[in-house]
């Protein structure tokens, strides 16, 4: 290698050695953009040196024999050195922040003889920013100092002999820059330096693909803490996620940070690595939100790549509302087994579902009616004057009633099953058809209704025969109701003439009257409404005072005779039953067919009607089935399912209701028994008696609609919320039940099956009496239970005289109410626990009664005992019970009285299966007998070592033992009470009721 230099030979040899070992072969970092690299230039650098004899450029070979260029200076013998070396003009490109990397060696001044005063070990780095090359002159005052550079390690003469490398690397930053380029300058002030390499670069974040977004090359910011936000561009066949655009940040070190948002593959494409590939044939992706392509659903296909949906096969369709992942479907086949039933001008159609529903669950039915001339073979649509029950189209059930047909006319009915794709099909309609001929028509509408006479409590009406009787009119039906009630409840009167007098009306009240005619073909339509206001009390009194006294006496006598005849007649026919007999009631309660005196509302047994349907229509409102929406099944009754749903009457908001349905295949007797409950309930109107909304008897299924009670039966509700109510809340529930029973007793109605299971609770904890319609017959079996068609009802709630002599009165209901009180205060425990029915009857006859439930106030238990008096005449009336409970509610302190203060001691009821506690020798044996031996140590630790001490324990004592389970507390306390009773009975201190 040839060297040309003005430096001393020992300096040059050192430099050559350094050059041979200066190149490290370091790879360029990917995030750096090189502007200048002296090592990469093999020709002369030709930088400017001032003065010319200062810095000197030399060349050499590295270990790979590649030429490299370097600059050296070693003016250490003279002081005040000022040697400048300037690079050529460097274009900065897009950089805002420049990095300068220097690699150099520096001689230790102490290793040079005679230079201690003039030798330095540092040099200075400068830059000058300019938009263009300014030539070869160096104006020192234009340059800005970057830093003073010192060596971390310097070498000596000894290092040269040992061939040790001591190469220094320093990096400095410049910026922010505002011009197009710049110069670098190196100032030597008297050091011995070899500038091995100079590298100038800036950093940027290289282009990458992240979350399917392409982020381009991005130059870093001008500050060390800068983060440059970059918005990505989605790769091919991808799109930005909604409201989540892809973004990343380029740091000052050239690294991508903080990814935000992303791109997702479009419909028909799925992600594979950093690209989106199309779905293959037979696959699809309907939305960019889906991750992967899916196989086409049943009866669909895709014959090209990148499909966003699959096309349906021939004869198969997809409804507009069907999502793409749903299989293609087809219209259903025709309904099966179409049958009909003609009733004069009304036709009932029933059918079975189609054999093929087309693969859908939204099958409904629509009816097409055609009136036909069979002689000419032509049919025309029936027109809009035909009525359909419940409706003509959109039928969910498989039956319909078509009304208002012409008499003696020919009709064809087509029943078509449709689903969500029927309207898309171009195939021929599939339907079941039937042709019929109607019979005689019902009469037309009654007209000319007029009021003839209006009094205080009666109205006389007259009317004209229908214009088209269509047969012999056998009777007229007058429907009337108070206008304020808006037909919520109505009454009917029937007559054979074209006039009638409606009695027992309220004075000063507006009534609405409508009349319809009846023939062998059925009822015609009601006449238009006629509003009539009865006279006020004062007006009637004034009128009556003007009458002749003799006439008044005669009228009173005649009225008295009529009343007597009706009472005798009612007594005779009163032995007929509706569901269950009232014939065994005593006194005035035996006469359940009452003449209705003004101001008194009395229960009327529906069975007194020759036609039970008349009782239903008199006491229950007929509802339109289309106003009822059944939502779900909540139970099963004796006659069918019990459902919850909504009732929407015209002009009113919809309300939640419970719907009892009559099962398919019912007998006429079952139908009458089913509707008998509605006939009974329709007579009641009290906030603590379940309210009847109405009935549906003119369609299928037959329904009874009552108000919906959210919390269900009282016994199950109490068991579910064991211990969660205050005594006041429980007494409030009992007061509501008593108020409902008082109302029923005042009407002369005997419930006969009063129990917590037959009390319903609404969302406001209001209790209401229910269950009025089951048919009950007393059997002479040893278990003494009621037998119904649906099962047996236990006698635990029944009064002794009702079991033994079948005497059912309001007093027997009071006995049952006492049992309900016990159920409520014990949170739904079973009365008499596991005792057999025969044991219960025997214990009651011997005078034993149920003990007070845990934490039951003495006053409440005393009221229970009063209800359980053997002599029914000594039991309180429901009116008295309501008064007693009202006093307790007004004086809550009375409910805190300890049980021990009962005025009349009793012997708690003893189960024959209960262990004889006198046979136990220890507390441990007793606990083992009642399966509570786990608490033996608790009793021993508390000092309860004898049964006598245990018998004196209270509920607080039991809780103090650490027994936290409420069920275990109740079981132990009940056993203690029984133990206490046995001990008292043993010593002759027990007193029976």
UniProtKB/Swiss-Prot annotation:
It holds the Pfam family Ephrin_rec_like. ATP binds at residues 634-642, 660. Residues 628-889 form the Protein kinase domain. It catalyses: L-tyrosyl-[protein] + ATP = O-phospho-L-tyrosyl-[protein] + ADP + H(+). Residues 1-27 form the signal peptide. Heterotetramer upon binding of the ligand. The heterotetramer is composed of an ephrin dimer and a receptor dimer. Oligomerization is probably required to induce biological responses. This is Ephrin type-A receptor 7. The lineage of its organism: Eukaryota, Metazoa, Chordata, Craniata, Vertebrata. The gene is EPHA7.
